[in-house]
């Protein structure tokens, strides 16, 4: 794998050699390395060869976010595979937690991301993943249909396959669709998994990574913030300073949070199952 990475980097940086290769802690999904090649520092994710499509999708999403020129993301240098392993090579940006100032700036940047480009439909040109969960993104013109079916219904079906039952799937999907029926927002490019673990302060300001992008309601990104008390509230303040949210957005917030709560429940079980069921019960009773 390292020979393949060196070859791809040499095509962009000229001949060099690997000067440093340290495995990083916390690689819960993929192995992660800090690599120095020809004086440049890189962050390398690697896994089994069969997982190359996931790395390709992640690279495509980072490049899509970069094209918006609104947010900072790690530059992608290489994505590929050898006989045994697949890998994704990006800039190495030593992460620090966001402070109040950088959180405010990030909020402004996210607001501008949501304003970028015109897209008439909801979805994405390819499917991707929320953490390790496959995420479908088939294009759909009605937001209520897209979110009810491809977000909530999809999570409920995956849970059912694992033996986890939250209720009648068709009835829940219909309820969610009705809750959103009168809400048809302008599609915005979303990060899709905007929690504190995917935001950091780098050498040149805040940056985001590990996206789960799609074109959706901008409120979905903001709905993540209250789920993470460690996320600085200034992100929300910065966002509001550029693109104020509608007065009724809090009515939809628990609907959008349910997607993440169901995903956590299926992945981690335990108390997450209780939290997701309670959230769903409150929505159905409203």
Curated annotation (Swiss-Prot):
Family: Belongs to the fructosamine kinase family.
EC number: 2.7.1.-
Protein purpose: Ketoamine kinase that phosphorylates ketoamines on the third carbon of the sugar moiety to generate ketoamine 3-phosphate. Its precise substrate are unknown: does not have ribulosamine and/or erythrulosamine 3-kinase activity in vitro.
Protein keywords: ATP-binding, Kinase, Nucleotide-binding, Transferase
Organism the protein comes from: Escherichia coli (strain K12)
Record-linked PANTHER family: FRUCTOSAMINE 3 KINASE-RELATED PROTEIN, PROTEIN-RIBULOSAMINE 3-KINASE
A molecular function (GO) term: ATP binding
Enzyme class, spelled out: transferase
Chain positions recorded as ATP binding sites: 91-93
Top-level taxon: Bacteria
Protein name per its UniProtKB record: Probable ketoamine kinase YniA
InterPro entries listed in its UniProt record: Fructo-/Ketosamine-3-kinase, Kinase-like_dom_sf
Gene, per the UniProt record: yniA
Active site residues per record: 193
